[in-house]
């Protein structure tokens, strides 16, 4: 049965840095930032917060189409949500990854998550390569030593890469933006994510994001999971 869509957007300011809020069935999402495909600024930043990971594909799709997909930083933050949903439900997670990704990015993400989320006699649950907690590694406050327990609401902090925007030269048209997603799960805290915006669409897509699924530091203790 379809959930009731109880969404409301509340604009809390008029500038590009103004925070906006979106609600869906008791889950709250906010975004703030001035990252944009229209122009490059090395000082540009973005922040996304969320009280919960979307419960299912319906919520994820609504969030993307109506709110976070309209900004590069919102779209980049949604990849960690999609990775978590994939860990909970492979079919729904795959649909989420497909929804927000440039086609060539889908197999790259899914093939790695299958390995890192799966267990076998060669990769038991206590093996350092098995990293079900990987989606939490870019959430603010999550570190190996605290069991990758992030602060709440969950927060993804981003800033512009030193690499300027580029126009896609093959497989279509669009502006590719290079964004650093900050995370304490690796020695290199700046995790590069490429986001693309096509000229005929108001939505963004994740073009490439290997830094988000690269093996992070082994956890110390028990991962509590995400809400």
Segments predicted by a language model, with ranges:
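Short, flexible beta-strand-to-coil junctions
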Residues: 11, 81-88, 182-186
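Cleaved targeting-peptide boundary
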Residues: 19-25
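Short beta-strand edge/turn micro-motifs at domain boundaries
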Residues: 22, 178-180, 185-226
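Core segments of small alpha/beta cavity-forming domains
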Residues: 30-138
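Surface-exposed, charged secondary-structure patches
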Residues: 108-184
